[in-house]
């Protein structure tokens, strides 16, 4: 279930932050558009449990959506997934679907949501297949 905005951040606060940071840097570097997403490993999926990971992903992805809506000519939204060390990929599939419905064009898939413990199977393992199947079906719709 989607969570409400956390914390309550106004559009003006988002604009101010983006214009003094990301947009300023883009202009300084001569770029006019960027893929906008959190780094999967920096989102600390190994902290907390699956429910924490889901809420954290929803809140972050909702903020990314807002940024992309405020500056659609600059930010292309890419989502983070609620990966958690002991969770299967169902939560990630559900969040991917939610984000695709919001207009996201991609996602960050963390091959090691265990935070450096490498407890997950390699990306070629069947564990990942349900996610790949969903991703492929989405790609075919585009």
Language model feature labels by segment:
Residues 1-142:
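Helix-coil boundary/capping segments in enzymes
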